Amino acid sequence: MKRADFCIIGLGRFGMQVAQSLKENNFNLLLIDLDDKKTDTASQQFDYVICCDASNLTALEELQIDEFAGVIVGVTNIEASIMICANLRELGQKNIIAKAKNEVHKRVLSTMGIREALIPEKIVGKNLVIRLIHGLENEIINLGNEIIFIRSAVNNKAFFNKRLEEINFRQNTDANIISIMRSNKTVVFPLGPNTEIQPGDIITAVCQQKSLNKYLNYINPKTKNKN
């Protein structure tokens, strides 16, 4: 098996949504769940899916979990979530993002040294507000700590057939471009300085929330954004 970039444990709605978004951006994934029905369903969409008990330290150790770029824990059961996160920490995985059921669960995970504990319902609310402010046509996700993940079409004709090195998004907008989806749905990743912007491109980027208006106005100068 090719080394996956991310491991997702727990294939409920949250875990599968994260997996689908990462897949669309050309990341390699390993998906894990204890429920064989969920893994059977997931295996129809993803290449690497394992049915195993992630609360079992030995099972995780065999997967060399510390070599993954990050692990997303989407388990709903609080006790199982805590056990899995404890195992991940013991095995040396530091980049852990975990779903929390409530504020108490979130605090427990934070005290364990989990990098990010998220309550999905609150995140959804924040994302909707940001989209209402900046335009519902943009796919915007608040990653926490004022960091925004955004996917948006490029309508600035001045950028068409120009190289990323010439446009210099980072210097002009404080945004980092992650990937580009062409009009034929082909995803360009990773990107290089000579990668060109073409008509119909949809760009995925990460930026600070305070720089979002600057970025959107740069790629779509006719867009009227509030604030």
From Swiss-Prot:
This is Uncharacterized protein MG323. It comes from the Bacteria. The lineage of its organism: Bacteria, Bacillati, Mycoplasmatota, Mycoplasmoidales, Mycoplasmoidaceae. SUPFAM superfamilies: NAD(P)-binding Rossmann-fold domains (SSF51735), TrkA C-terminal domain-like (SSF116726). GO terms for molecular function: monoatomic cation transmembrane transporter activity. InterPro entries: NAD(P)-bd_dom_sf, RCK_C, RCK_C_sf, RCK_N, Trk_Ktr_HKT_K-transport. PROSITE patterns: RCK_C, RCK_N. Residues 134-221 form the RCK C-terminal domain. PANTHER family: KTR SYSTEM POTASSIUM UPTAKE PROTEIN C, POTASSIUM CHANNEL PROTEIN 2-RELATED-RELATED. Residues 3-119 form the RCK N-terminal domain. GO terms for biological process: potassium ion transport.
